[in-house]
Amino acid sequence: MATALSEEELDNEDYYSLLNVRREASCEELKAAYRRLCMLYHPDKHRDPELKSQAERLFNLVHQAYEVLSDPQTRAIYDIYGKRGLEMEGWEVVERRRTPAEIREEFERLQREREERRLQQRTNPKGTISVGIDATDLFDRYEEEYEDVSGSGFPQIEINKMHISQSIEAPLTASDTAILSGSLSTQNGNGGGSINFALRRVTSAKGWGELEFGAGDLQGPLFGLKLFRNLTPRCFVTTHCALQFSSRGIRPGLTTVLARNLDKNTVGYLQWRWGVQSAMNTSIVRDTKTSHFTVALQLGIPHSFALISYQHKFQDDDQTRVKGSLKAGFFGTVVEYGAERKISRHSVLGAAVSIGVPQGVSLKIKLNRASQTYFFPIHLTDQLLPSAVFYATAGPLVLYFALHRLVIRPYLRAQKEKELEKQRESTATDILQKKQEAEAAVRLMQESVRRIIEAEESRMGLIIVNAWYGKFVNDKSKKSEKVKVIDVTVPLQCLVKDSKLILTEASKAGLPGFYDPCVGEEKNLKVLYQFRGVLHQVMALDSEALRIPKQSHRIDTDG
């Protein structure tokens, strides 16, 4: 799978990788790495004018890396924000004797100023479209009623309700935000709408408050107040009180929620609601990397119920989740099960089957696209019919796998190739420059590598036979893909010292003599080496630390 290409992937030199030192490297380690590279790239060591020019440029790059990492202040900036952090406006006013913590605070201040200038550009739109479909004629059809009716051979599927809501946010200051929202609903030919305006203020790091004003054609004006407060680091409370004006008078309402973190993954909620539908609700929610579990109990008028639900999260690229729940109360019993899966970078598709008494059988399809939600509840039957349950379960699965194989997967593959091609075109000049720099570095290494090989051969030490870096294609179905690996035998041999080769946890593309042959794609380093006269082989991930020789890399030739 292709990795995301950041803006800094080409522009930001990895100074640690260039010097081949750990991010926690001491001053002595930095100095030793700097001296070794200076001996390799010093312009005075090369007489050929072309090599001398290339050596001078590489020497300056190594010197720049050492200057940044050897200074505690610039190193702190680089560690936190990269090379772009060093170039950010405003650092000229920072005192030279600041600590890393003070530097972080200064950078965050500069970032806040930049964010404030972009406040007006953020609206954070959110929307929901719900379309209720009545498909009961598919399963609850009485044939005798339609025998004498012309054109009644096809079941009637109707849209019986719709709901549309939308909201936007407009940041006024760093602590004040205006929120405008509206909704329209219709059911069986009757409908209405409302519009709301809210003003939210963050009062402190522990809380915020929100004033709400609303009006609609079916209900009168609405005035509300919402408060949030962190009582302790593990406990918070929210309160929402509202006054709804109507022809029948004023209807007050109050909702209070008290929540507490019971442990790292578990939160307990206690809710009290007073007004039109008074109730007391308590629930426990446990959310981990692989599961989500909820148990709830509500006592209220007119609804009282108990709920238990479980969701399993698969650790795959598509973020697949399966879920099931049981809800029982005065209104009846409902069993629901379903699944959801990521179908693109910003889209999640889900489906659930609801089986209840007296509700019947329903199929619910939901698509989340960024901050927009599209919801389609399809009512199949008022009765508990096995055929309805079967088709509600099997139908979406068959349809999804057919669409995924015939439409979604080819589309995503084409989009991925298009993005990669666009990246290659936009970075072609930079890649060519990096390639030329790497080739120049390899030419400058030749004499040093020759001496290293002679020394290693004399003691039966570490000899790099072959080394390749880039994207390896192992799947036979992808053999037609263009080879995207480069030979890095010489650069790796140049890093051998005392029959050892140690590479740190960083992208190998930043090492001297290396470059990225396939920007935006996953890369590996494959090394075939000889130690004590025995062949060894290892394959390492791009950012994986590597230490050779190792006994586990030995190639078994006994068979």
From Swiss-Prot:
Required for mitochondrial inner membrane organization. Seems to function through its association with the MICOS complex and the mitochondrial outer membrane sorting assembly machinery (SAM) complex. InterPro entries: DnaJ-like_C11_C (IPR024586), DnaJ_domain (IPR001623), DnaJ_domain_CS (IPR018253), DNAJC11-like_beta-barrel (IPR055225), J_dom_sf (IPR036869), Mito_inner_membrane_organizer (IPR052243). Associates with the mitochondrial contact site and cristae organizing system (MICOS) complex, composed of at least MICOS10/MIC10, CHCHD3/MIC19, CHCHD6/MIC25, APOOL/MIC27, IMMT/MIC60, APOO/MIC23/MIC26 and QIL1/MIC13. This complex was also known under the names MINOS or MitOS complex. The MICOS complex associates with mitochondrial outer membrane proteins SAMM50, MTX1 and MTX2 (together described as components of the mitochondrial outer membrane sorting assembly machinery (SAM) complex) and DNAJC11, mitochondrial inner membrane protein TMEM11 and with HSPA9. It comes from the Eukaryota. SMART domains: DnaJ. Residues 418-457 form a coiled coil. Pfam families: DnaJ, DnaJ-like_C11_C, DNAJC11_beta-barrel. The gene is DNAJC11. Keywords: Acetylation, Chaperone, Coiled coil, Membrane, Mitochondrion, Mitochondrion outer membrane, Phosphoprotein. It is a peripheral membrane protein. GO terms for biological process: cristae formation. The modification N-acetylalanine is found at residue 2. One of its GO terms (cellular component) is nuclear speck. Belongs to the DNAJC11 family. Residues 14-82 form the J domain. The modification Phosphoserine is found at residue 204. Signal peptide: none annotated. This is DnaJ homolog subfamily C member 11. PANTHER family: DNAJ HOMOLOG SUBFAMILY C MEMBER 11 (PTHR44157:SF1). It is found in: Mitochondrion; Mitochondrion outer membrane. It comes from Bos taurus (Bovine).
